[in-house]
Design a protein with these regions (language model features):
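Short, well-formed alpha-helical segments that are part of the catalytic scaffolds
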Residues: 83-99
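Acidic donor-binding/catalytic loop of UDP-sugar-dependent glycosyltransferases
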Residues: 89, 110-111, 157-170
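Glycine-rich, basic loop-to-helix element that forms the pyrophosphate-binding segment
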Residues: 127-145, 155, 209-218
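Short aromatic/hydrophobic "clamp" motif used to bind/position activated sugar donors
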Residues: 150
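Conserved donor NDP-sugar-binding/catalytic core segment of glycosyltransferases
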Residues: 161-194, 272
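Short, flexible, basic/aromatic active-site loop/helix in glycosyltransferases
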Residues: 181, 196-217
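Acidic donor-binding loop at a coil-to-helix junction in glycosyltransferase catalytic cores
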Residues: 244-250, 283
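Active-site-adjacent helix/loop segment of glycosyltransferases
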Residues: 264-265, 270-329, 338-437, 451
Length: 472
């Protein structure tokens, strides 16, 4: 196997220490480990004797695989397309040659015509008499599939050429249970389409990653994923009782059972954006409302922010007009970080750098929460307290301004009118936050609203040997 170090990984102390991964992990390397790291940096094949270290690098997100062709091809894949009141033909036409295609019509108002499928062995059109939701539709499709790999592709998605081949190589690792592509919004002339090209909740960006809770890539959307059938069956498949958030739930259950899940942005699937402001608001509200149901199944993992008290104190001091005190509070953890780092010439500098990065990220989380999940509290505080009003307004305005400026660097068709961007950003954030509060009240679960401290939740992934049936 060939792998590459994560872009954030840093070799220190003459190569004897490696920092990287999400969450951050420190590796102390002996001579053998240093030779393995040298081979990784040179792009060489990693010998079998080094696979224990390689597993640790992959499981912490410190390194990422560079798979070859792998044991599977497109004929080993059944594509399952759940449909409800949509035209699946653009999706089906973009799939190319695969083992089989199964369309599940989840009680569309106008039934999907049988002629949408290119009839070949294994192709099927299945129907639900009543609407049961996308998770149930995917389960129906899975029950009819016989191939070792399953691709779930929503009917509002159009895969780019070569998307499947870019994902299949990852399954040469028998512990990989799921791989997801980059899901980008289709560019269009409308304000919503332009906004979604920059801020789609399905677009996780251009940087690959391991997928696991409490990491940089905490989930992937089920709009398009390829799953090992044995892995899906080992956790009971998608939960049909969840109409939203079922993809997050599945990924977290797979990881909990020891399966590796990967995000591979070299594979691209395009997604049609919502056509109206009301539809966008309903979508974001639904996403927010699913957080409490996920908190019931995975307590502590959906907290809107993970914050240390010192970081909150530091940013509170800055907001109150005491920037020096706030900065000192923000850098205070450098003392404890220094003790945790191994003795090396760069220890002091790295401790300060890590403390500063942690403080900045805490500020980003606070700003996001104040305008998204905590906006009812922030709005109330701005009316009650004049002193709080100015920093809260700045907290709301600065991210919006930065977001709009970023649209200027994109293609011409993605650039937003500033007023349209502000309105859409407000609808996006307020709808999501309202959904979180509605779900928390309905489920009586405050975990989707309250922040937590690092380390308060332990998410353990069971070490796993490839199960029978995982191999080709």
């Amino acid at each position: 196997m060939r792998v590459a170090l994560d872009r954030t990984a840093r070799r220190l102390d003459g190569g004897r220490v490696l920092l990287g991964g999400s969450p951050l992990t420190v590796f102390r390397l002996g001579p053998g480990g240093r030779r393995v790291l040298d081979a990784i940096e040179q792009g060489d094949e990693i010998p079998a004797a080094a696979h224990d270290l390689l597993d640790r690098l992959l499981d912490t997100g410190t390194a990422h695989p560079r798979p070859g062709p792998g044991p599977f091809n497109a004929r080993d894949v059944t594509v399952i397309v759940p449909v409800h009141d949509e035209d699946p033909r653009p999706t089906l036409e973009a799939l190319g040659a695969v083992g089989a295609t199964i369309v599940v019509d989840d009680a569309s108002g106008v039934p999907v015509p049988a002629g949408v499928l290119h009839i070949s062995p294994g192709d099927r059109l299945l129907r639900h008499a009543t609407n049961r939701g996308p998770a149930a539709a995917r389960a129906t499709g899975r029950a009819a599939a016989t191939t070792p790999l399953l691709a779930f592709v929503d009917a509002d998605c159009v895969p780019d050429e070569g998307w499947l081949e870019a994902l299949l190589g990852h399954f040469e690792d028998e512990r990989v249970g799921l791989v997801a592509p980059l899901v980008r919004s289709l560019r269009g002339p409308g304000a919503i389409a332009r906004y979604e090209t920059m801020r789609s909740p399905l677009d996780l960006g251009p940087v690959e990653g391991r997928v696991a809770p409490a990491t940089r890539v905490a989930y992937v959307p089920a709009a398009a994923v390829v799953v090992r059938a044995a892995a899906l069956d080992s956790v009971g498949g998608f939960d049909p009782t969840l109409r939203v958030g079922e993809d997050v739930d599945l990924v977290w259950r797979l990881v909990s059972e020891g399966w590796r899940c990967r995000y591979e942005p070299r594979a691209v699937v395009s997604h049609r954006s919502r056509e109206s402001l009301a539809a966008l608001a309903r979508q974001r509200f639904g996403y927010g409302r699913s957080a409490a149901a996920l908190d019931r199944r995975h307590p502590g993992l959906v907290a809107p922010a993970v914050l240390q008290p010192w970081a909150v104190a530091g940013w509170t001091a800055i907001a109150a007009g005491w920037p020096l005190a706030g900065a000192l509070a923000g850098l205070a953890p450098a003392v404890s970080l220094r003790r945790r780092l191994p003795a090396m010439p760069e220890r002091d500098r790295e401790a300060v750098r890590l403390a500063a990065l942690g403080f900045i990220r805490a500020g980003e989380q606070l700003a996001s929460c104040l305008t998204r999940v905590w906006w009812p509290v922030a709005l109330t505080a701005s009316f009650v307290s004049r002193r709080a009003r100015r920093p809260l307004l700045a907290t709301a305005a600065v991210p919006i301004a930065i977001g709009w400026v970023r649209t200027l660097g994109g293609p011409g068709e993605s650039r937003s009118n500033p007023l349209a961007y502000v309105v859409l950003r407000a609808v996006d954030d307020l709808s999501y936050g309202a959904g979180v509060w509605a779900g928390a009240l309905r489920e009586r679960r405050p975990g989707a609203i309250l922040p937590r401290r690092p380390g308060k939740v332990r998410f353990r992934s069971r070490p796993r040997r490839p199960p029978t049936g995982a191999r080709r």
